[in-house]
UniProtKB/Swiss-Prot annotation:
Gene (UniProt): hcnB
Localisation per UniProt entry: Cell membrane
Entry's EC annotation: 1.4.99.5
Domain of life from the UniProt record: Bacteria
One GO cellular component term: plasma membrane
Name of the protein in its database record: Hydrogen cyanide synthase subunit HcnB
Organism annotation: Pseudomonas protegens (strain DSM 19095 / LMG 27888 / CFBP 6595 / CHA0)
Oligomeric form and interacting partners: Heterotrimer of HcnA, HcnB and HcnC.
Amino acid sequence: MSLNPVIVGGGPAGMAAAIELAEHGVRSTLIEEASRLGGVVYRGPLRDGVQLDYLGPRYCEMLAKLHGDFADHEQMIDVRLNSRVVGAEGTQSLVLLDGEEQVQQVSYEQLILAAGCHERSVPFPGWTLPGVKLLGGLQLQIKSGVVKPQSPVVIAGTGPLLPLVACQLHASGVRVAGVYEACALGKIAKQSLAMLNKPQLFLDGLSMLAYLKLHGIALRYGWGVVEAQGQDALSVVTVAPYSSDWQPDMAKAQRIAAQTLAVGYGFIPRTQLSQQMGLEHNFSDDGYLRASANAWQQSSEPHVHLAGDMGGIRGGEAAMLSGRIAALSILMQRGVLSNEAALQRRQGYERKLASILRFRGAVDRYTARGAGQVELPKGDTVICRCEHTTRNDIERALSQGVQDMASLKMRTRVSMGDCQGRMCVGYCSDRLRQATGRKDVGWIRPRFPLDPIPFSAFPPSDQEVSQHD
């Protein structure tokens, strides 16, 4: 085989896959849209010399190890930073917008898609105000070591990322006004035994809770955001206790002064490219679309592999293991490893992965979102920020008989902006599933290009050149 395996995505999954290939003497091409490798989890500071001690010693150790391992094998990896894959031509080549903003075609014989995920946006009144941010984006901001959010900060949502970011913000010098976990404490406690599958992560969680208590940062379980208010920017956040299905009790609502509100309700796999390639997909219990893969991380096209969050949200450590398994499949396809040798290594990775998946299952169960979340937006709340589609528009379409995402798109123009539904697909899917009682209501279908391409990216035609001579 003459062409390098191509890896799309330079996060932990893509980096681990490239390392595994390099360890066996196989060169690869790694395409990453950011200016640094590592993804959202392990990208590190944007400037050299910036210390990230406030992120904790264990994180800094894992960050250094991943980048150190990669540096040891970098001579075997063709790294293309600031390069975006904007489309696919079948399952043999990709269309790339490179760092010079020129369109290129990249052919491959084997491909690993490790495109990661994006945050689930949950609309509520005031969510478009300046100062309201997604939690993962806020964490990436402090990980960059360059810019910190304005204080005080309120954190709301569900999941282990809430206390983690609260601790990191406080340690970096940012004032945290409170953390509001939508799930009740009892629901989390029921999953404590399963979470012991990863003892260190469980202990890390307890350590974070102790840190918040020591520094007087309120962590309230069974509470969530109701509304964000302000004139030109955020100034007040309204929170309230939630019922078991996340219905807010407005009689007990509280208003909190804040300049930043960070909301985090989990993540959704980035399947735009895998959809465009025509690969098979399925729906998770949480309602998001994910690409289907077998035990070798092979998609419905055996030479196209999936790694990391493409097949489901499982975290950075699991992403690295899935990337290595995908690389083993390629090594087997290229005849570098025998089936027996590849299987033996895969089983070793799977043993590590099993405990992570049991831990992750517990997290997924306690962070399961309640039906009341869909009712948070008022009628005039914007759902699709690109097309200014409101909840009233969506409710009108449902009353007219809309049953799936494609019909909703035609009636309301949701997802027709540049982001292609990344911001609104979660809510639209939730509302359609609630209204129809169906698990599969379709998904936003991506269109080419996946990201905008400047006109300057295209070379002038011969006719245009002759007209200017």
